[in-house]
UniProtKB/Swiss-Prot annotation:
Species whose genome carries this gene: Drosophila virilis
Region feature Required for chromatin remodeling, strand pairing activities and coupling of ATPase activity, mapped onto this chain: 2-9
Keyword ATP-binding: yes
Protein name: DNA repair and recombination protein RAD54-like
Top-level taxon in the UniProt lineage: Eukaryota
Keyword Nucleus recorded: yes
UniProt keyword annotations, A-Z: ATP-binding, Cell cycle, Cell division, DNA damage, DNA repair, DNA-binding, Helicase, Hydrolase, Meiosis, Mitosis, Nucleotide-binding, Nucleus, Phosphoprotein
Disordered: region residues: 740-786
Positions bearing Phosphothreonine: T22
């Protein structure tokens, strides 16, 4: 069939003009196309045989309608990346750099702008006489960060910037001592990003920075930089790898002297930094940040000396625990960030330490005490220029309520028999007879044995089976059906209470739980109990690799996973982990250092937590665990001072100290409550409530005291108290200081305790309380009298 021709082909008329362009003919065959192309080229050639290309096709609008369509089609170019946000200079066009007026990277007049530096105000006459290329500009925090910073975080960023830039004095270092959960990491990310991008001179202040942290937190720092900066900056995280690869990578980082590096921030652990310090100390670094900086309290260790050799004047030290009780440690931390502030070690002793310690002696004169007070005030006033500390009272504005409970659990009959037999043994008697270094070491081992026995007899079964000193005749104490590899909660008061509470939580709520212990052997028992009750769980201890830790934490925090328990070794993961997937935490055994326990217990009440939190500290009634708790309380009450010269509560024991530790207080509800000599309680029953301005950060004497399960803020604990019959006493309080709570009900004032019959009951809190901020200066802390 013959193909019909188009009208233009039938007419044979084509317009040939240099000013007009006609659409090509429909393709017939290759020969016809070549002929047509030659015709077009010949029509465009001039006398010099130069081709004049036609103008590009343009849309011609002949009516209002056509103009409207043209506006729609002529839309502005859009970057084809989802949720793309330009970092800076988004309105700039390509081309030759134009001479423009120097201006800040971000608008200082914008809403919610955080201005860290304001240049001097010049008159128009002064501005004309100055060199335009040297005019200073505002330093403004990137809006992507300033819009998410809370008021206390904005204050912290401003404080650190002024310190590292020397605006607050003749120094360039600072200590960020905020308590856990206040966002120290976000504040440091903001400071680092600002210094890498801005300065009053319209150029970066620094080109590189190093963040040194425990190995378990290196990955967390990388996630925080990515999270808050939305991937605008790449960090170099040193996680494992061979020695050759690590050396090559660090050498490339050290030798990179460009103003803008591809990876300007190095994330490295303390151990790796110490091993490769000879590489990193070759060149200058803009700033170093030391996370968990209390590791640097000893100026004689190799890590401290390696970091001191780093060529940088800007040093930031982060520590969520207060600087406590030792002037030498105090000097080491301050001297690291600002080496010249307190002089040399001998200068510090001569000017401050000797006078302060002399005034603390029991036989000191009034003049020596007065001079000690003067020197203390002088020292605090000097170092406060570079130290900022805020308590987690601030979090009460942003986080759900937190309930803290110290639960005294009675020893079982088996535990009590083993405990008393060991105290009466020749092993303990010899330890108390003399206080030489050798016997002190033996006493420390005996203390550890008693602490493990308070957890569960399984932890000392090997000593019992081997008939070691102190357990020669203890084999008969264990029940006939005893199996060491099959955990029996009924042999331990604390384990029995834990078993009942976990069952109640699992049956009546969707809460997740964190279990923390100082001993991996206790974690083994947790695992056996979880398998016995068919609870899903994850475990993190020192044997887990750094990469796997991050995956385990992410899995547990995922609401979609049915992971009920997170078992944590306080030595391996007590610092820096964010476990907001859980809202209940059990601290199964106390540590000598209260800072270690506080770090571990701060894993759940953090930014991102959506549910009320319950913190349980379990101690065995009348045992050595209560003695440790009392020493913790005494040490915490001294935390506002820097005067106590005790290095470690576990290393300097007098004979009287040891006798007190090895004394078992039988038939008491709580030895700690007895030593408080509480005037609000009569015969262990509370008659008066605590002060209205108290909260869970106050001294234990200002907490609620309960000798029965009535008046407890947690119905889970109340039910477990009745079911297990092993709880003797409870101290409890909440995070909001002015919250109205019921006093513990006496026998004469009965009220029915609500039973656990729904998931809503399990999280019973007063959600409508209008809590105000707590004033930390209004608390009147008291010392324990022991």
């Amino acid at each position: 069939m013959r193909r019909s021709l188009a009208p233009s082909q039938r007419l044979g008329v084509r317009i040939k003009s240099k000013d007009a362009f006609t659409p090509p003919l429909q393709k017939k065959n290759k020969r016809v196309c070549q002929i047509e192309l030659q015709k077009r080229q010949s029509a465009l050639r001039d006398a010099t045989n130069t081709v004049e290309l036609p103008l590009p096709i343009r849309f011609t609008a002949n009516s209002d309608y056509e103009q409207a369509i043209a506006k729609v089609l002529a839309r502005k170019f859009k970057v084809p990346i989802a949720n793309y946000v330009p970092d800076y200079g988004g309105n700039r066009t390509l081309g030759v750099r134009r001479s423009i007026v120097r201006r800040a990277l971000h608008d200082p007049q914008a809403c919610n702008a955080l201005v860290l530096y304001t240049p001097p105000a010049y008159t128009e006459h002064e501005r004309m006489s100055l060199d335009p290329s040297k005019l200073q500009v505002h330093v403004v925090v990137d809006p992507i960060l300033s819009n998410v910073l809370r008021p206390h975080q904005r204050e912290g960023v401003r404080f650190m910037y002024e310190c590292v830039e020397g605006k607050r004095g003749n120094f360039n270092g600072c200590i960020m001592a905020d308590e856990m959960g206040l966002g120290k990491t976000l504040q440091c990310v903001t400071l680092t990003w600002t210094l890498l991008r801005q300065s009053p001179d319209c150029k970066p202040t620094i080109s590189k920075a190093i963040v040194v942290s425990p190995s378990s937190l290196v990955k967390n720092w990388e996630k925080e930089f990515t999270k808050w900066l939305h991937g605008r900056m790449h960090c170099l995280a040193m996680e494992g790898g061979s020695k050759e690869d690590t050396t090559r990578t660090l050498e490339q980082f050290a030798m990179n002297t460009a103003t803008r590096c591809g990876t300007p921030v190095l994330l490295i652990s303390y151990e790796t930094f110490r091993l490769y310090s000879h590489i990193l100390c070759k060149t200058e670094v803009g700033m170093v940040i030391c996370d968990e900086g209390h590791r640097l309290k000893n100026s004689d260790n190799l890590t401290y000396q390696a970091l001191m050799g780093l060529k940088t004047k800007r040093r930031v030290l982060l520590s969520g625990t207060p600087i406590q009780n030792d002037l030498t440690e105090y000097f080491s931390l301050v001297n690291f960030v600002n080496p010249e502030m307190l002089g040399t070690g001998s200068d510090f002793k001569r000017n401050f330490e000797n006078a302060i310690l002399r005034g603390q002696n029991a036989d000191s004169t009034d003049a020596e005490r007065e001079r000690a007070l003067e020197k203390t005030q002088e020292l605090v006033g000097l170092v406060n220029q570079c130290i900022i500390r805020r308590t987690n009272q601030i979090l009460t504005k942003y986080l759900p309520v937190k309930f803290e409970m110290v639960v005294c659990a009675k020893l079982t009959a088996v535990q009590l028999q083993l405990y008393t037999n060991f105290l009466k043994s020749d092993q303990v008697r010899r330890s108390l007879a003399d206080c030489t270094d050798k016997t002190t070491l033996t006493a420390l081992a005996d203390i550890t044995t008693l602490k493990k026995l308070c957890n569960h007899p399984d932890l000392i079964y090997e000593k019992i089976a081997a008939r070691e000193k102190g357990f020669e005749n203890s084999q008969n104490v264990l029940p006939p059906n005893y199996k060491p590899k099959d955990v029996n909660p009924e042999l331990s008061g604390k384990f029995m209470l834990l078993d009942f509470m976990l069952a109640a939580i699992r049956a009546n709520s969707d809460d997740k739980v964190v279990l923390i212990s100082n001993y991996t052997q206790t974690l083994d028992l947790f695992e056996q109990l979880a398998r016995k009750r068919k609870y899903s769980y994850v475990r993190l201890d020192g044997t887990m690799t750094i990469k796997k830790r991050s995956k385990v934490v992410d899995r547990f925090n995922d609401p979609a996973t049915d992971c009920f328990l997170f078992m944590l070794s306080s030595k391996a993961g007590g610092c820096g982990l964010n476990l907001i997937g859980a809202n209940r935490l059990f601290m199964f055994d106390p540590d000598w250092n209260p800072a270690n326990d506080e770090q571990a217990m701060a894993r759940v009440w953090r930014d991102g937590q959506k549910k009320p939190c319950y913190i349980y500290r379990l101690v065995a009634s009348g045992s050595i665990e209560e003695k440790i708790l009392q020493r913790q309380t005494h040490k915490k009450s001294l935390s506002s001072s820097i005067i106590d010269n005790n290095d470690s509560a576990e290393k300097h024991f007098t004979r009287d100290d040891l006798k007190d530790l090895f004394r078992f207080e039988a038939n008491v509800l709580s030895d700690t409550h007895n030593k408080l000599k509480c005037k609000r309680c009569f015969q262990d029953v509370q008659r008066q409530p605590p002060p209205e301005n108290s909260d869970c950060t106050s001294h234990l004497s200002q907490w609620f005291h309960c000798s029965n399960n009535r008046g407890l803020p947690d119905s889970i604990l109340s039910q477990a108290w009745m079911a297990s019959k092993c709880v003797s006493f409870v101290f409890h309080h909440r995070s909001q200081g002015d919250a109205k709570q019921p006093t513990c009900i006496t026998e004469d004032n009965h009220s029915e305790q609500p039973q656990l019959n729904s998931k809503r009951n399990a999280n019973s809190v007063l959600e409508n309380d209008d809590d105000e901020d707590f004033d930390p200066n209004s608390s009147d802390e008291k010392f324990l009298g022991f």
